[in-house]
Amino acid sequence: MTEYKLVVVGAGGVGKSALTIQLIQNHFVDEYDPTIEDSYRKQVVIDGETCLLDILDTAGQEEYSAMRDQYMRTGEGFLCVFAINNTKSFEDIHHYREQIKRVKDSEDVPMVLVGNKCDLPSRTVDTKQAQDLARSYGIPFIETSAKTRQRVEDAFYTLVREIRQYRLKKISKEEKTPGCVKIKKCIIM
């Protein structure tokens, strides 16, 4: 069974835990309890492949920012979550993305941009703004509602598909790299 290490990042109060718990337990948590760090595991079937999702739900509060580098090192893919009714959380996405790229030392890291709380009428972030940002990053964008469960699975499963593509690209790049010839040596004593 293939394991995928997913990390959910974003500002405090955007619904990272609500999305994760909705996926894992089919339950909406409506009281806000700031997360320090929670880990969840769930076995699912995506495109006919049985997968084990290892999901790290992270702290959005700035006082826990020192912990970010550590979980960013171990994560394979990142759900970058903002709330559609919180412009600041949308603006913060750039900071999270840059930090992920720095820690991973790569421009090419599997990510999905997630606009959560799409069930709310009080939108301050336009869908087109988010689509344009995702397009500029070269990543998918999905609007979700942890409350109604709208596209929650889709967000996580899309990230798994992004990781799969990344893994395949990495393997094919390694196979094409010249100079990867094993040199055999003899030691004469």
UniProtKB/Swiss-Prot annotation:
Task performed by this protein: Ras proteins bind GDP/GTP and possess intrinsic GTPase activity. Plays an important role in the regulation of cell proliferation. Plays a role in promoting oncogenic events by inducing transcriptional silencing of tumor suppressor genes (TSGs) in colorectal cancer (CRC) cells in a ZNF304-dependent manner.
EC class: hydrolase
Family, per entry: Belongs to the small GTPase superfamily. Ras family.
Species, as recorded: Homo sapiens
Residue span of motif Effector region: 32-40
Outcome recorded upon mutating G13R: In pylocytic astrocytoma; somatic mutation; increase activation of the Ras pathway
Residue numbers bearing the N-acetylthreonine modification: T2
SMART domains: RAB, RAN, RAS, RHO
PROSITE patterns: RAS
Protein name from the UniProt record: GTPase KRas
Lipidation (S-palmitoyl cysteine): C180
Effect caused by changing G60R: In CFC2; characterized by a defective GTPase-activating protein sensitivity and a strongly reduced interaction with effectors
Positions bearing the Glycyl lysine isopeptide (Lys-Gly) (interchain with G-Cter in ubiquitin) cross-link: K170
Assembly, per entry: Interacts with PHLPP. Interacts (active GTP-bound form preferentially) with RGS14. Interacts (when farnesylated) with PDE6D; this promotes dissociation from the cell membrane. Interacts with SOS1. Interacts (when farnesylated) with GPR31. Interacts with RAP1GDS1. Interacts (active GTP-bound form) with both SHOC2 and PP1c (all isoforms) to form a tertiary complex; SHOC2 and PP1c preferably bind M-Ras/MRAS, but they also bind K-Ras/KRAS, N-Ras/NRAS and H-Ras/HRAS. Interacts (GTP-bound form) with MAPKAP1/SIN1; inhibiting K-Ras/KRAS activity.
Binding of GTP, residues: 10-18, 29-35, 59-60, 116-119
Consequence of substituting D38A: Decreased interaction with MAPKAP1/SIN1
Membrane topology: Lipid-anchor
GO cellular component terms attached to this protein's record: cytoplasm; cytoplasmic side of plasma membrane; cytosol; endoplasmic reticulum membrane; focal adhesion; Golgi membrane; membrane; mitochondrial outer membrane
Modified residues (N-acetylmethionine): M1
Gene: KRAS
GO molecular function term, any single one: LRR domain binding
Modified positions (N6-acetyllysine) in chain numbering: K104
Known outcome of mutating G12A: In colorectal cancer samples; somatic mutation
Outcome reported for the amino acid change (mutating V14I): In NS3; affects activity and impairs responsiveness to GTPase activating proteins; characterized by a strong increase of both intrinsic and guanine nucleotide exchanged factor-catalyzed nucleotide exchange leading to an increased level of the activated state
